[in-house]
Amino acid sequence: MVGFKATDVPPTATVKFLGAGTAACIADLITFPLDTAKVRLQIQGERQGPVRAAASAQYRGVLCTILTMVRTEGPRSLYSGLVAGLQRQMSFASVRIGLYDSVKQFYTKGSEHAGIGSRLLAGSTTGALAVAVAQPTDVVKVRFQAQARAGSGRRYQSTVDAYKTIAREEGFRGLWKGTSPNVARNAIVNCAELVTYDLIKDALLKANLMTDDLPCHFTSAFGAGFCTTVIASPVDVVKTRYMNSALGQYSSAGHCALTMLQKEGPRAFYKGFMPSFLRLGSWNVVMFVTYEQLKRALMAACTSREAPF
C-alpha cells in the first residue's frame, strides 16, 4: 500500500468538501503557470483574421509562452490572478468535486451501484452549481491572467480592485459574465473529469490490475485529464474569450463562438490545447492524488480523536 491506508469508515460529506477545496488549491499552486499560458494562447489573435493572427502571433507554444512572459513581464506574471484562482478553487472545487458523491447517491437513491446515467447527472449538477457560486472569482482570474502585457496599462491593481471595478463599470452582471458558456463547460468538464476518473478507477480495481492506492489514483487522474481536455477545449476557449472581452465586443457567448469561426476558422476552438492538456493532466493528477490522501488522512485523524486509546 502506497500512501495513507483507507479507513473502515467512509469519508463524511464535510471531509470530502474541505478535502476537495484544499486539494484543488494545492493543484492550482503547482500548475497555475500552465493555466496562464493557456489563457494567453486562447485569447491571442481574437481581433485579427487567421492569416494575420498567425503572422503576428506573440506566443507559439507552451514553453515559448512561458519564456516570453518571464522575459517581458517577469516571473510573477505567471501567477497573475493566483489569489482569485485560489478563491475560485475553494468555492468551486469544494462544490463540484466535494459534493459529487453525495449527489450521486441522491440520484441512485442510496444504492451502492451507480450507473453511467447517475454519474453523468451528478457531474452535471455539481458542475453547474459550482459555477453559480464561483463565477465572479473565475471572471477576475481570467482578467488578471490576460491583462499583464508589455506596453499596455493594467486594468486592475489588485484582486479587490478588480471586483470593485468590474461591478462599477459593468454592473454586477459583469461579475457573472460568461456564466452560460461556463455552465456548459463545467457540466462537460465535471462529467468528463469525475465520471472518467470514477470509471477508470473502478475498472482497474475490478480487473485486479491495481489496488486502491497512489498508482491507481495517478493512472485514473491522468486518463481523466486527457479525456476532459479533448471534450472541453472548444467551450473553454469560448468561455475565456467571452469573459475577457471588452464591454460590447460580443453580444453573447454564441456570437463569440461564431466570430471565432468566421475570423480564425475551426482550429481556433483548440487554441491552447497543449497547455490545456498539460495543465489539466497535471492538475488532475495532483488534485485527485492529494484529494484521496487528504480524505484518508482526515478520516484517520477523526478516528484517532474519537478513540485515542
Curated annotation (Swiss-Prot):
It catalyses: L-aspartate(out) + phosphate(in) + H(+)(in) = L-aspartate(in) + phosphate(out) + H(+)(out); oxaloacetate(out) + phosphate(in) + H(+)(in) = oxaloacetate(in) + phosphate(out) + H(+)(out); (S)-malate(out) + phosphate(in) + H(+)(in) = (S)-malate(in) + phosphate(out) + H(+)(out); malonate(out) + phosphate(in) + H(+)(in) = malonate(in) + phosphate(out) + H(+)(out). Keywords: Membrane, Mitochondrion, Mitochondrion inner membrane, Repeat, Transmembrane, Transmembrane helix, Transport. One of its GO terms (molecular function) is proton transmembrane transporter activity. The keyword Transport applies. Residues 1-16, 104-119, 200-217, 295-309 are mitochondrial intermembrane. It is found in: Mitochondrion inner membrane. It is a multi-pass membrane protein. InterPro entries: Mit_carrier (IPR002067), Mito_Metabolite_Transporter (IPR050391), Mitochondrial_sb/sol_carrier (IPR018108), Mt_carrier_dom_sf (IPR023395). Residues 16-63, 278-285 are annotated as: Important for interaction with long-chain fatty acids. Residues 41-77, 146-173, 243-268 are mitochondrial matrix. It comes from the Eukaryota. One of its GO terms (cellular component) is mitochondrial inner membrane. GO terms for biological process: adaptive thermogenesis; C4-dicarboxylate transport; cellular response to glucose stimulus; glutamine metabolic process; glycolytic process; macrophage differentiation; mitochondrial fission; mitochondrial transmembrane transport. The chain crosses the membrane at residues 17-40, 78-103, 120-145, 174-199, 218-242, 269-294. Homotetramer. Adopts an asymmetrical dimer of dimers functional form. Interacts with MICU1 (when methylated); leading to decrease the calcium sensitivity of MICU1. The GDP-binding domain is located within the hydrophilic cavity, with GDP phosphates likely forming salt bridges with the charged residues, Lys-141 and Arg-185. The long-chain fatty acid-binding domain consists of an hydrophobic groove between peripheral transmembrane helices 1 and 6 near the matrix side. Belongs to the mitochondrial carrier (TC 2.A.29) family. Antiporter that exports dicarboxylate intermediates of the Krebs cycle in exchange for phosphate plus a proton across the inner membrane of mitochondria, a process driven by mitochondrial motive force with an overall impact on glycolysis, glutaminolysis and glutathione-dependent redox balance. Continuous export of oxaloacetate and related four-carbon dicarboxylates from mitochondrial matrix into the cytosol negatively regulates the oxidation of acetyl-CoA substrates via the Krebs cycle lowering the ATP/ADP ratio and reactive oxygen species (ROS) production. This is Dicarboxylate carrier UCP2. It comes from Canis lupus familiaris (Dog). The gene is UCP2.
